[in-house]
Structure formats: structure tokens, C-alpha cells
Amino acid sequence: MALSCVFFHAHPDDEALLTAGTMARLAAEGHRVVLVVATVGEQGLTAGPVDAGRLGEVRRAEVLASARALGCARVEFLGYGDSGLDGRAVADGGLVPFAGVDPEVAAGALADLLREEDAALLTTYDPAGGYGHPDHVQVHRVGARAAELAGTPLVLQATVDRDLLLRALRLLRLVYPLPIDRGAFDNAYTPRLAITHRIDVRPHLAAKRRSMSAHATQTTGGESVRTLAALLRLPGFLFRRVLGTEWFVQPDLPVGRVIRDPLATLRRNQG
């Protein structure tokens, strides 16, 4: 039976890095995949021909292209402003910064969409927002409350295997001058033993690469190589190794046995 699966993200390109393979997999299986983005990421870094004042407009177009590459049936924007890395950014055009909005208000809007879609699955982030970005933390708060309001049966927190991330950063920094303090990620995302879902997305890496490539503005800017650009430059075998798995935590599930199917809980309950 085809199900409606809603993926909730903070900014354009978050979907490409965290859940693109799972989205492509579910779409290929015939499920309805919906992408919800809280902001258009207008505070992000960029360089080249894009004027900073138009960055949000361009990134909106980029995430729509990414969604097409993944087979999404619908893309919705909650319409909040990008709060910036420190949560203090002044949103453009009078928008309310997402990190500062009342979570109950934003959750109500998302819950309306979940009900409209009769969503079986909602993905959010872990309580720390992965690496602590204020908008990512807010995605967790808003997503958890929206699922509660709408009665969405399955909530998965998109995350990264912290142990693999630290090894990958060591490897990437041998090749690229990444602007990343490895120590900043010592407590980021989720330790391997706390992860409940490990999803093999290698059959869908072509779609994931197209999704990542759609976010051209996020491959430039800053003083050194951007993370997205570095990942896209990886040779095929390393791309498969680094990006061939996606990880989730199901908060109400005891850790232990690793689940390989994002919809396993729903299938078990239906069976």
C-alpha cells in the first residue's frame, strides 16, 4: 500500500545531505514523498553571480530542482526566515526567524499539512538539531509537536552516525582544506549504538548526487572548500562509502537491533 511520507527540513540542501537517498528509495517504491522546508536559507554563504539579496529566491529554486530529482510529489515552504548559525540573523522581507517562532504556531501549520496528507511518516531531527544550528533544533521541536497534534504514527529523527562522521572528516581533511573544526563534532549527531535505522541508499545514489548538485550556491562561498563541494568531488567508491547509508532514530524504539527499512514499524503494525 502506498503511504504518504513527509520529510521536514530546516533549509534547502539539508534534504540532500541527510535524507535524499531515503526519499528517492520511498518514491521509487511508489510512496508519496512530500518535502517541507522551514526556510529558504537566505542567510547561507555563497559566492559568484548570485547577489546576496536574491539568495533565498535562488535557493528556493534549487530545492525544487532537488525535489524533482528525488521524485517528490509535493514541496511546501513554511515561510519562516533563516535564523543564521548563531540564531541572531535578521530575516529578510519581514519574515519571522524560524528559531524565534512560537513552536506551537509552526507546529499547527505543519500538523495541518500532515492531516491533509494523511501522513504515515514524518522525519525531523534529533533534539540537538544534529550539530546545534538553531533552526535544526527548532525542526525537532516543531516536528515532534506537529506529529503529536496530527497523530502521525511514525516519527523518525534524521541523523548521522557520529563515529563514521568523525572518520570521514579526518579523511576529507587530508584532501581538502575544510573550514571545519573536527572537535566541534565530537558530540554532534548520534553515536552509532543509539541509532535505530540504518538505511542502504546505494541503489539511489545517482538521484542523491543530482539532489546535491542542484544546490550550486552551497558549493561556493567562505574562505575554503565547502562541505557539499568536497563531497561531490569524491571518487565514486568513496562517494558510495560515505553517502551510501542514511541514519535515523525512532525515539519510541529501544536500541539494539538495527532496522534496514524506514517503514518497518508501519509494516509490522499493519501485519
Listing of model-derived features with the role each one plays in the protein:
Residues 1-118, 145, 249-252:
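Active-site rim/loop-helix segments in enzyme catalytic domains that contact anionic ligands
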Residues 2-6, 90-91, 95, 100-271:
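Metal-dependent de-N-acetylase/amidase catalytic core
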